C-alpha cells in the first residue's frame, strides 16, 4: 500500500515530520470518522508543503486524495450510530433477546452498608416486567419470559438480564448459584449483569472472567452522572472515580462493559450533560445506555420536585430532548455502542415527562432529526 512505500525513505525535515505523523495516525484510525478527522488534520499541515518535490510527500498527497474519494462514498452510507442489535451480531448468529430478572438482591445504598433510602429517583417497579417477582426462581422467570417472546420468534436465544437492584451484592457462592441457574435454562446463551461501581470485588471479577471463556457475559454499571455534586444530590453513594475504576478493572479482564447515565438530573445544565460525553468516551466502555430523567411516584425525588420544581428540567418537549441527544451522540467516541436513549415507566407510576412514545417511535424521530442535521456519532468527538 502507498503508506508502506512512504515509510522507506525521507529526504527533507518537513516531509519527515509530516509523513511520520501521517503514518502513525493512519495505522490507528480504524473507524471512518477517525479517518476523516485524520484527513482534515493532515491536509491542514500538508497544504503548506505542496511545493515540496520529495517522492515521499508526493505519495502522502496521493494517499490523501484517495482517502478523500473514499470519504465521499462513506458519507453516503454513514451509520448514524452504533446500535445494540448490531453489536450482538458479533457474538451470536441469530436473534437474541434480553429477559429481565429480579433475583431477590437488595442494594448497599438501601440496607445501610453505603446508605439508606436508595437513590432519590429509584423505584424498581418501573423496569421490571410482570413475570419478575422475587417469589419466583430465576429459572421460572426465564421460562415465563421465554414464553412471552417465543410466539414471535421460535428460534430466539436469550440473555438473562439481572436487572433489579444490585446484582453483584451478595456472597460469592450465592451469586454463582444465581448466574449458573440462569445459564442452565434452555436457550439462554449469556448473562447481562447490572450493578453499581462500588460492588465489584476482585474475587467476583475472577469468576466472571473464567465464566466468560465459555459464555457471553456483559457487566453493566450504573454510572448515572460524571459529576460528584450530582451523585451526592441523588444519594448514589459512590463517586465518579469509583465508576472509572470499576469500568477499567472490568475491561482489563476482557469482559464487555456497559454503562448507564441519566440526562436531566437536577442541577445539571445542558453544558454539563454535553461535557459528560467526553468523560464517558474516555472510559473503556463497549456499550452505553442513555435515558431521560423520569419522575416516579413514591420516590424521594418526586417529593423534592413538589417542594422545588425550579431545580428540575424535565424535557416536557420531546424535541428538546432529541436535540440534546443528537448533540450528545456527536460528541461520543465513534466505536461506542448505544443501546438505548429513553426509558419507559408504567403510566400509573410516571409523573413526568409523558411523551406517549414507544422506544422505536422515539428512535425513528431521533434518526430523522440526525439525517436532517447531517449528524452522526463521533462527528464532534475530540480525543
What are these regions (language model features)?
Residues 125-145, 149-172, 187-200, 216-242, ...:
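Core AdoMet radical
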Residues 241-301, 319-342:
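Conserved C-terminal portion of the radical SAM core fold
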Residues 51, 60-61, 69-71:
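Short, positively charged and aromatic/hydrophobic N-terminal segments
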Residues 12-15, 52-54:
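Cysteine-centered motifs
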Residues 97-101, 158-160, 191-193, 217-221, ...:
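Hydrophobic faces of well-ordered beta-strands that scaffold small-molecule active sites
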Residues 74-88, 92-97, 295-383:
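Auxiliary Fe-S-binding modules of radical SAM enzymes
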Residues 70, 74-159:
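N-terminal [4Fe-4S]-dependent radical SAM core
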Amino acid at each position: 500500500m502507498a503508506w508502506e512505500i512512504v515509510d522507506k525513505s525521507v529526504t527533507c525535515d518537513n516531509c519527515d515530520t509530516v509523513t511520520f505523523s501521517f503514518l502513525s495516525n493512519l495505522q490507528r484510525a480504524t473507524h471512518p470518522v477517525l479517518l476523516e478527522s485524520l484527513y482534515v488534520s493532515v491536509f491542514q499541515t500538508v497544504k503548506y508543503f505542496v511545493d515540496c518535490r520529495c517522492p515521499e510527500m508526493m505519495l502522502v498527497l496521493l494517499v490523501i486524495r484517495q482517502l478523500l474519494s473514499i470519504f465521499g462514498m462513506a458519507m453516503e452510507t454513514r451509520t448514524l450510530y452504533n446500535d445494540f442489535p448490531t453489536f450482538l451480531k458479533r457474538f451470536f448468529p441469530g436473534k437474541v433477546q434480553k429477559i429481565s430478572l429480579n433475583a431477590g438482591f437488595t442494594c448497599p445504598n438501601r440496607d445501610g452498608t453505603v446508605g439508606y433510602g436508595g437513590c432519590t429517583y429509584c423505584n424498581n417497579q418501573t423496569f421490571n416486567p410482570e413475570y419478575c417477582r422475587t417469589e419466583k426462581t430465576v429459572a421460572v422467570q426465564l421460562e415465563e419470559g421465554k414464553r412471552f417472546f417465543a410466539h414471535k420468534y421460535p428460534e430466539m436465544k436469550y440473555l438473562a438480564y439481572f436487572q433489579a437492584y444490585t446484582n453483584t451484592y451478595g456472597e460469592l457462592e450465592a451469586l454463582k448459584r444465581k448466574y449458573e441457574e440462569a445459564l442452565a435454562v434452555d436457550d439462554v446463551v449469556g448473562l447481562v449483569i447490572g450493578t453499581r461501581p462500588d460492588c465489584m470485588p476482585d474475587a467476583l471479577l475472577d469468576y466472571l472472567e473464567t465464566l466468560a471463556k465459555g459464555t457471553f457475559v456483559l457487566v453493566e454499571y450504573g454510572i448515572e452522572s460524571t459529576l460528584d455534586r450530582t451523585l451526592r444530590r441523588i444519594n448514589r453513594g459512590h463517586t465518579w472515580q469509583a465508576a472509572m475504576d470499576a469500568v477499567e478493572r472490568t475491561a482489563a479482564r476482557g469482559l464487555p462493559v456497559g454503562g448507564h447515565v441519566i440526562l436531566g438530573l437536577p442541577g445539571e445544565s445542558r453544558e454539563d450533560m454535553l461535557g459528560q460525553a467526553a468523560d464517558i468516551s474516555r472510559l473503556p466502555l463497549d456499550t452505553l445506555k442513555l435515558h431521560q430523567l423520569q419522575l416516579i411516584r413514591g420516590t424521594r425525588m418526586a417529593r423534592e420536585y413538589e417542594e422545588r420544581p425550579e431545580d428540575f428540567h424535565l424535557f416536557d418537549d420531546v424535541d428538546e430532548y432529541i436535540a440534546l441527544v443528537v448533540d450528545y451522540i456527536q460528541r461520543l467516541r465513534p466505536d461506542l455502542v448505544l443501546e438505548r436513549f429513553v426509558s419507559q415507566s408504567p403510566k400509573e407510576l410516571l409523573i413526568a415527562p409523558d411523551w406517549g412514545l414507544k422506544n422505536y417511535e422515539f428512535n425513528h424521530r431521533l434518526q430523522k432529526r440526525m439525517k436532517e442535521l447531517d449528524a452522526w456519532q463521533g462527528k464532534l468527538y475530540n480525543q
